Regions:
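N-terminal hydrophobic/helix-forming segments and targeting peptides
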Residues: 1-418
Length: 418
């Protein structure tokens, strides 16, 4: 299969942040990486390949060079996507149906969740003999739907509508009480009374597909940011460096500000890098010579809403690596890091394009500037161009994933003197 087909498969397995980490973990295991645990003593060896997971939803992998290293070459993306999360007491008996009480996670296009097959995935937690155990859940079948209100009862719906999650976005699940809890418990082989906690989300069941007259586009759920997560992981697994530690990182909770123990604003990255170095002096010297790519997708020019993009800094699907710029440093790219990215792209034979928001339409921030609060190093914000960001079904360019993989491979082997 090609990169796009493999990406679609990766997305299909990564129904939430926990399954995204599990999918990455499986790829790392296949490639001979060893899992380390934060509560254990580490014995990191030259030439070794390792990964660390925090909260089951963030992951950092690294490969040591066979000799003393000079710096860290880091690529970071995120594992989470906007969705609806189940509330602790989620079943509502309403007029012959059981519907589920949900809360919005991240900023989503709510209408894109209507009238399509949905299901539930995430994790549940049990405890036995004082030991907490986490199990992943994926109800791998069409289970739920959030039905629209018929136009006969909402005549002005096409003139614009403000959705209310509590009223409009509760999925219907059954005509019997308690069945969803039973199905979740059966999925992981426990009694529902054993479930002491859960983090469960809805996900769109529609599989990704290639489209366009020549297959130049593809659509899928969670392209933001699994396209970058997949591309950076594949680039990492197919790269090597003689002089630097190569690092792959994927953080949770980017969509809600990253301010969690497993988010980009946490100590996770710093903790891992410090333990690789063993002492403060080595760590500080290495970080001073290091470089990070913060990888998160960007808004392509929308052909139906072209005026929403900047007049000159416009990016297009299949146009290659997007270098993201913001005067207020919501993106970390500056003249130095921009030059590094362009240099790497040219060496990789990969096209690049410059992105800035329209000056009167502010965009969102991403990982780089937040991660820099804990690990201050030269960073550029990059991504790939896509449409319908934060829809439950997004669209991107079929050629761009390969561009990103090639660029990341080149980045990891590049010696950057700053």
């Amino acid at each position: 299969m090609g990169y796009t087909e493999n990406l679609i498969d990766f997305i299909g397995k990564s129904t939430d942040c926990y399954h995204a980490v599990k999918t990455a973990k499986d790829r790392l295991d296949e490639n001979g990486f060893t899992e380390l645990f934060e509560g254990d003593k580490w014995d990191v060896q030259s030439g070794g390949k390792y990964y660390v997971i925090r909260n089951s939803s963030s992951i950092i992998a690294f490969e040591m060079p066979k000799k003393d290293f000079g710096a860290f070459m880091i690529c970071a993306s995120h594992t989470d996507s906007p969705s609806f999360k189940l509330k602790p007491d989620f079943e509502i008996n309403a007029d012959g149906c059981i519907k589920l009480s949900v809360e919005g996670y991240g900023g989503m296009i709510m209408s894109s969740w209507l009238d399509r097959p949905l299901s539930i995935s995430g994790r549940i937690v049990t405890a036995k003999d004082g030991k907490v155990e986490t199990k992943l859940v994926n109800i791998d079948r069409d289970l739920l739907v959030i039905p629209s209100l018929a136009i006969h009862m909402s005549r002005d719906i096409n003139k614009g509508y403000e959705f209310n999650i509590r009223r409009d976005m509760c999925p219907i699940a059954s005509d019997k009480n308690g069945r969803i809890e039973d199905i979740i418990a059966e999925n992981v082989g426990v009694y529902k009374e054993e479930i002491l906690g859960f983090d469960l989300s809805l996900y769109n069941r529609m599989r990704g597909t290639v489209l366009g007259t020549d297959g130049e586009y593809f659509s899928a759920p969670r392209i933001d940011d699994l396209q970058c997560m997949y591309s950076t992981l594949e680039g990492f697994l197919n790269s090597e460096s003689d002089d630097n530690v190569t690092v792959f990182a994927a953080f949770d909770n980017e969509e809600v500000g990253s301010g969690t123990k497993q988010g980009a604003k946490s100590s996770f990255l710093r903790d891992v890098l410090e333990r690789i170095c063993n002492n403060s002096e080595t760590y500080k010297r290495a970080v001073a010579k290091s470089f990070m790519l913060s990888c998160d997708n960007a808004h392509a020019v929308h052909p139906n809403f072209a005026d929403k993009s900047d007049g000159t800094n416009r990016v297009y699907m299949n146009g290659g690596i997007v270098i993201k710029y913001n005067a207020n440093q919501r993106y970390t790219t500056d003249a130095v890091s921009e030059a590094v990215v362009k240099y790497v792209c040219k060496n990789a034979g990969v096209p690049y394009q410059m992105y800035a928001n329209r000056s009167d339409i502010p965009g969102g921030s991403t990982l780089g500037n937040l991660s820099n609060e804990k690990v201050s190093l030269n960073t550029a914000d990059i991504g790939l161009a896509q449409l319908a960001m934060h829809s439950s079904y997004e669209t991107a360019g079929s050629r761009d994933t390969e561009y990103m993989v090639k660029m990341i491979k080149e980045f990891y082997k590049t010696e950057i003197v700053l």
